[in-house]
Amino acid sequence: MTTRYIFVTGGVVSSLGKGIAAASLAAILEARGLKVTMLKLDPYINVDPGTMSPIQHGEVFVTEDGAETDLDLGHYERFIRTKMTKRNNFTSGRIYQDVLARERKGEFLGATIQVIPHITNDIKRRVIEGAEGYDIAMVEIGGTVGDMESQPFLEAIRQLALEVGRDRAMFMHLTLVPYLAAAGEIKTKPTQHSVKDLRSIGIFPDILVCRSDRAIPNAERAKISLFTNVEEKAVVSMRDVDSIYKIPALLKAQGTDEIVVKRFGLDVPEADLTEWEEVLYHEANPIGEVTIGMVGKYTELPDAYKSVNEALKHAGLKNQVTVNIKYIDSQDVEVKGVEILANLDAILVPGGFGERGVEGKILTAQYARENKVPYLGICLGMQVALIEFARNVAGLTDAHSTEFNSETPHPVVGLISEWLDEEGQVEYRNEQSDLGGTMRLGSQLCHLVKGTKACDVYGSETINERHRHRFEVNNNYREQLSKAGLIFSGLSSDKSLVEVIEIADHPWFIAGQFHPEFNSTPRDGHPLFESFVAASFKLQKS
């Protein structure tokens, strides 16, 4: 199979939405019958984002095969059907780590290791391997043109485009076209300079996507075309919209996909965006709304919970209700009390790490249990629910997780010392292991107990969900907690680890050790989130 490459770069400022723009174009091309994949190349020196602060970087998206990746890969999976893997995201840190390891082994036969050709060659190799087997590979370069860290990646894609030829490679550049209210006009100069910088390193954009808070007039598009040497029809206006799922239709309306297929000489049918039209219809025509409180540690940056946010929206689409998310810092629950949780239709406690705010999450789980408020716990959200139940129902005073209190008399949650990875191989860990890359990661098989709410929600006794955690339920307490009324409704493939818990005497109280949000998409939703939102809406109406 001959793979074509679309390299996506950004200029002027960061956070313009390169990932969403690239994913939207990929969605249109997929709707034309093409097999599409996407890669994200991150210039930072971290080996992966696994140990980075969510406040700085946003969420860590976990792939089925256990890679800790950039949150843009979540956008990719939500827009196209292709599942991302370890091949779809790599960083400068990963490149340098691997190249230096090979140098230590003597694989370069004494050569002086340099950015060109050794680093750039490794980047090209990874791009080619990640794109193998697909008609189209969208390759997004993180950061902006002009960043020092991006230079090796930009040089690598310049070389790769030259090597494969113009009929197999093209460049899409995303820029900001600001509107100055004082002058009452759109300013194109930043875009002109951004393209000039890109051209100075040998990259000539074929498509220019112009981000603005409004549609860019034809006269301004013509001006941009003139000064950037990009065809006017390829100067695409991407205005602000109230839903990211409108972007595919916005790009298609301007013929962006047609530019691609003509350039690559592809004979493919027109894009069928019926599924996306259905998504937009449900989004625009809700029959009600619910307010869900998300009680977490990183609430100052919603992107820290990006996939959870989107999964709740998807569940709203499936139930034809608007989901309003109220972010609540778990420390505020500790300081101000559970009264701040009043008037919520449901409560969700997402994953997280560290002791700060954990008692607030435990209080939140108690409030939801005692007041019959629908509760969904994810990862740490399951652990705090279990700790709360152990303390206040099972009579295990001062029960806790050893992550937060190594001296607790009742360690109902403890460090996993061994587990099976996504390939069924045994993994080991102890207190001295590195933090990075040593968690239970990736998609794992889970057995649900027949007759439980979790089994009814999924409609199956076996499921696959993605994990990212070091701590698990202590099996020594399972019998005691079961006798107190806690239901262990899901277990790992070898039945050794608790995956799902629930409470019977409650309208809807389910918590899972896994991260179901990573499997939710706007077109398909996710059964756990759909049931959670449905229960919230039902109780609101009762």
From Swiss-Prot:
The active site is at C379 (nucleophile), H515, E517. It is an enzyme of class 6 (ligase). One of its GO terms (cellular component) is cytosol. UTP binds at S14, K187, T188, K189, P190, T191, Q192, K223. It comes from the Bacteria. PROSITE patterns: GATASE_TYPE_1. Allosterically activated by GTP, when glutamine is the substrate; GTP has no effect on the reaction when ammonia is the substrate. The allosteric effector GTP functions by stabilizing the protein conformation that binds the tetrahedral intermediate(s) formed during glutamine hydrolysis. Inhibited by the product CTP, via allosteric rather than competitive inhibition. Pfam families: CTP_synth_N, GATase. One of its GO terms (molecular function) is glutaminase activity. GO terms for biological process: 'de novo' CTP biosynthetic process; pyrimidine nucleobase biosynthetic process. Keywords: ATP-binding, Glutamine amidotransferase, Ligase, Magnesium, Metal-binding, Nucleotide-binding, Pyrimidine biosynthesis. Its EC number is 6.3.4.2. The keyword Ligase applies. Pathway: Pyrimidine metabolism; CTP biosynthesis via de novo pathway; CTP from UDP: step 2/2. L-glutamine binds at G352, L380, G381, M382, Q383, E403, R470. CTPSs have evolved a hybrid strategy for distinguishing between UTP and CTP. The overlapping regions of the product feedback inhibitory and substrate sites recognize a common feature in both compounds, the triphosphate moiety. To differentiate isosteric substrate and product pyrimidine rings, an additional pocket far from the expected kinase/ligase catalytic site, specifically recognizes the cytosine and ribose portions of the product inhibitor. This is CTP synthase. The lineage of its organism: Bacteria, Pseudomonadati, Pseudomonadota, Gammaproteobacteria, Alteromonadales.
